[in-house]
Every structure is written in structure tokens, then in C-alpha cells.
């Protein structure tokens, strides 16, 4: 459900002007006149006082809920929160943090950011902001972020507790633009094989990906794995720019068409950086929207193959209609189609958003994630790629060329319960904080860490013990063994993230990621 909400939040924005003139039918007995009279009557005559703004907002939401599952209304606050992760930057102090024991723990200061420049380091605890205590007072994460963020150029005083130093430290931090990156990882996964993982499609995504491509080519990249697993989408323009890097000038990337929106085509504007080397795109059931555009374009143009599982199936174009108060309607105006003519949008019932939200759950129960044969495709859904005329299928989402089943034995019920109670993340953060100095001293080179580091059994046993306090116990010895095995991998990845960065986190995970390993096998053996 959380993944579905994320996909809805980052559903890409069609680059269509929201200021287009709309003809509204006015006059006696018109629907808009009836709606206006109803609002006036309720506001002025209803027995109790009425919040007029909320009344109108609820009416807008009510109308949109009767349409498709991706048309929706957002308040000004919600709109800002939704756009920020995709807009490339925000104003703040520049730290990655987590809350541990009701205290803000700095995971990493942003490189060359305001906090790093004044000397704040990983492991510092921020206990007060401008003399207001934020530690041990049960302040919400949202309220803490409000205090830390502010306009560029303004200053904030931070009170810091640092391990090994008795007295509290005071830092004056001048807020600045903090970059928001969308690329999770880029590295050479094998000799000659580069790997790029993109988390979403934002304003800076194209630049991030092209810089990574150029860097990996210098390191000897001949083939590329482009990982779009869990990528919920983002901006259409970013998707078109990135797809362009795999195609030749003039190649069709995607087209949109709707009742009031004539067909609009998006084509490669130039020869791409990676138009000749092999490419494998990775997808799963949480790959959506803009990520499906890129996957579909590469597949339909026969530039590469798709490995993984069927994607989410979000193929509706939204136009943002912005009100003066900053709130917005995201109104579906068209479908988008891959170059072969496939509509990516999966079927839905108008007005039944709960059914739509439960679609992935139904697909899981039907066996789609574990058994390729559970997906029955009729001949009416057949399409053909544009160059090699391979069969591909429509009907919702992008079907992979090579199916990789979900390993359901990895994730035990016990582990899910431990994670839900935040026991895993809290214990890992405490461990890293206590051993950060020795870990950095012992593992100056990440490759040595990847090859030799083993998570202490005491850390895993401590997590199991904390779970027992919350009445979380395995059903049998087999579940306990599998839970410990998975914890060892997860904790190693978390240590790598906190000592280095997200790229190293995924390097640890990818050694056991079946979809990634299938792509490596395909590129190294050809089958």
C-alpha cells in the first residue's frame, strides 16, 4: 500500500500548460451553476458553522474520486511536499538523519553542504535548534524539519552532542540550496559491465545519468545494466531525455493521446551516448509511470531487453491545474503509448480506488510474482517490436523479456515484524554510531569491506532479543535461521550506507538480488 501511495505521489507530470483556456458552460440549469448555488446555500444556511475552504476541497476530491485512480487534488502543502523530491533542491542545512531514542542522529552531512562546511560530522546528535530542545521531547520529525529548513542565506544555531566530547558543541549554520539527487548507485558490477540504479525521474536525473555513463565508460564499460526496480516515475521530460541516450535521432520514445489532447509524439532529439552498447533494463511490480516509458521505449526499439517482473501499469497523463493558493488538481487528460502502440495503463474501474490500490496484492496472491505461467496473455494483446519484430504484450505494464520470480523465502514474518517495530534500523544505527571510528579505520577500501566484512553475531542476537521484548518470536528453528541470514545481509548493507553512501549499500544488496544477477548472467553468458 505504501509503495502504491509513493507511485501515486511521483506519477509523472505531462508537460502541458495548465493555463490553457477552458470553456465552461454557464447559464440556467448548467451543472456548474447548480454546484455554485449548492455551495452558497450550504455556507450561508446550514444549521452549524461550515469551513468553506474544506467544503470546496472535499467537493473537488469527491468529483475526482469518481474518475480514474490518478486524478486527484492536493493542497498547497501537499503539492510542495510532492514536488520537492523531483525539483532538484531545497533550502536547508544539508544532513541525512534518522531519529534514534527520540534524538536526531546525523547519518551523513551532504558533501560540501552547509553542515559539513562548519564541521558537523556523521554520528553527531542535534539536541537543540536555536535554543529549542528537539531531543527527548517527542517532537515530530515534521516539526524538526520545519526548524532545520528555511530560506537560503538565513542562519540557524545547532546544539550538538558528539561522542567522546563531554561538552555540547554549538554550530552556526548558514542555510543553502541542498541538491536532491535521484540516482541511487553507479559502479562497475563486473569487468566491462556498468550498473546504474535510478530511484525516480526528477529535474536533475538526466544530468546525473549522463555523468555516470561517461564515468563508467572511462572505467571500461561495454555493457550497461539500467536498474529501474522500485522506480515510481517522475517527470515525462526527464524520461524522454534519458531514453534518448539509448536511441538514435528520430526514434519514437512515447506518444500520448486523449479525448481533448491530440496525439503528441516524443522522439529522440539526437544520437544518444549509449545507442550502441548492450543494455539490460531491470523492472519489478513497483516500476511505474516514467520508468515504464523508458523500459517500453528500449524494448520496442529493440535497443535492449527487460529483465525482472511485470511493471505497475501506470499509463495516464496528468495535467497540473494550479489554483491561486498553491493547491492543484492533477487531471488525467490522456493515455501514453509505447512506440509499438501498447497502452501501459492497466485496467481499472472508475470510482473504485480501493480495488485499484489492491491490484498488486491480488497479483501476488494469484501467483504472478512467483510463476510466469500465471499470466495469461491473449493474442489480442500481441504487439511487435519495431526492428526485430519480436512479440511483446500490452494489457497493462511492461512485460519482461526474461522473467525472474520473487524469492518469497527470503522475507520471513519474523523479519517483517522486527522491521515494522523499527528494531532493525534502530539497533543498526546504534551499532554503527558506537563502532564508526574503528570501521572507518579498518575498512578504508570498500572492496575489502565487501569481500571480508561479516556482521557480528552479537548485533544479530541483540536484535532477536529486542524482538522478544516485543513478543516477536519465530514459529520454528527454520524461520529463525532464515531471519538471521537475511539480517546479516541487511545489516551489512546498512553499515556500508552509513560509512560510505547509497551506492555502496546497493553494491552489497546486489550480490544477492536475483534480478540483478540474472542480468549479469545474461550479459556474461548470452543466455
Regions found by a protein language model. Give the residues of each.
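Conserved functional hotspot residues or short segments at active or partner-binding sites
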Residues: 343-344, 348-527
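Hydrophobic beta-strand signal
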Residues: 127-128, 254, 305, 330, ...
Amino acid at each position: 500500500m505504501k509503495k502504491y501511495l509513493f507511485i501515486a505521489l511521483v506519477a509523472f507530470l505531462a508537460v502541458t500548460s495548465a493555463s490553457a483556456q477552458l470553456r465552461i458552460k454557464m447559464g440556467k440549469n448548467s451543472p456548474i451553476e447548480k454546484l455554485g448555488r449548492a455551495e452558497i446555500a450550504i455556507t450561508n444556511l446550514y444549521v452549524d458553522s461550515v469551513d468553506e475552504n474544506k467544503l470546496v476541497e472535499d467537493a473537488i476530491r469527491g468529483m475526482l474520486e469518481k474518475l480514474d485512480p490518478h486524478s486527484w487534488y492536493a493542497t498547497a502543502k501537499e503539492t510542495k511536499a510532492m514536488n520537492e523530491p523531483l525539483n532538484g533542491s531545497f533550502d536547508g542545512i544539508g544532513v541525512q538523519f534518522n531519529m534514534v531514542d527520540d534524538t536526531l542522529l546525523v547519518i551523513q552531512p551532504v558533501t560540501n553542504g552547509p553542515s559539513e562546511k562548519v564541521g558537523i560530522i556523521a554520528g553527531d546528535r542535534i539536541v537543540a535548534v536555536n535554543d529549542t530542545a528537539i531531543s527527548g521531547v517527542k517532537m515530530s520529525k515534521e516539526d524538526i524539519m520545519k526548524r532545520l529548513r528555511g530560506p537560503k542565506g538565513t542562519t540557524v544555531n545547532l546544539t550538538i552532542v558528539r561522542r567522546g566530547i563531554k561538552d555540547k558543541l554549538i554550530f552556526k549554520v548558514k542555510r543553502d540550496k541542498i541538491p536532491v539527487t535521484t540516482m541511487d548507485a553507479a559502479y562497475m558490477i563486473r569487468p566491462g559491465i556498468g550498473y546504474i540504479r535510478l530511484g525516480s525521474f526528477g529535474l536533475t536525473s538526466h544530468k546525473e545519468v549522463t555523468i555516470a555513463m561517461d564515468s563508467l565508460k572511462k572505467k571500461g564499460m561495454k555493457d550497461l545494466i539500467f536498474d529501474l526496480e522500485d522506480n515510481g516515475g517522475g517527470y515525462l521530460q526527464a524520461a524522454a531525455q534519458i531514453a534518448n541516450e539509448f536511441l538514435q535521432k528520430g526514434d519514437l520514445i512515447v506518444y500520448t493521446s486523449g479525448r481533448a489532447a491530440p496525439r503528441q509524439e516524443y522522439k529522440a532529439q539526437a544520437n544518444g551516448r549509449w545507442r550502441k552498447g548492450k543494455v539490460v533494463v531491470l523492472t519489478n511490480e513497483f516500476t511505474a509511470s516514467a520508468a515504464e516509458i523508458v523500459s517500453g521505449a528500449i524494448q520496442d526499439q529493440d535497443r535492449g531487453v527487460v529483465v525482472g517482473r511485470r511493471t505497475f501499469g501506470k499509463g495516464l497523463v496528468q495535467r497540473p491545474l494550479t489554483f491561486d493558493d498553491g493547491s492543484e488538481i492533477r487531471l488525467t487528460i490522456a493515455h501514453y503509448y509505447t512506440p509499438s502502440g501498447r497502452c501501459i495503463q492497466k485496467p481499472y474501474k472508475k470510482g473504485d480506488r480501493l480495488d485499484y490500490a489492491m491490484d498488486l496484492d491480488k497479483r501476488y496472491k494469484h501467483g504472478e510474482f512467483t510463476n510466469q505461467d500465471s499470466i495469461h496473455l491473449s493474442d489480442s494483446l500481441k504487439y511487435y517490436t519495431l526492428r526485430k519484430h519480436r512479440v511483446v504484450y500490452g494489457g497493462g505494464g511492461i512485460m519482461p523479456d526474461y522473467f525472474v520470480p520473487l524469492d518469497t523465502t527470503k522475507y520471513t514474518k519474523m523479519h517483517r515484524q522486527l522491521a515494522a517495530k523499527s528494531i532493525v534500523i534502530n539497533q543498526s544505527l546504534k551499532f554503527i554510531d558506537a563502532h564508526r571510528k574503528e570501521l572507518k579505520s579498518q575498512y578504508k577500501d570498500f572492496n575489502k569491506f565487501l569481500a571480508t566484512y561479516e556482521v557480528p553475531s552479537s548485533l544479530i542476537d541483540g536484535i532477536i532479543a529486542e524482538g522478544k521484548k516485543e513478543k516477536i518470536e519465530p514459529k520454528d528453528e527454520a524461520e529463525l535461521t532464515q531471519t538471521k541470514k537475511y539480517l546479516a545481509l541487511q545489516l551489512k548493507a546498512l553499515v556500508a550506507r552509513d560509512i560510505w553512501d547509497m551506492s555502496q549499500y546497493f553494491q552489497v544488496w546486489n550480490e544477492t538480488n536475483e534480478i540483478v544477477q540474472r542480468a549479469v548472467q545474461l550479459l556474461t553468458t548470452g543466455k
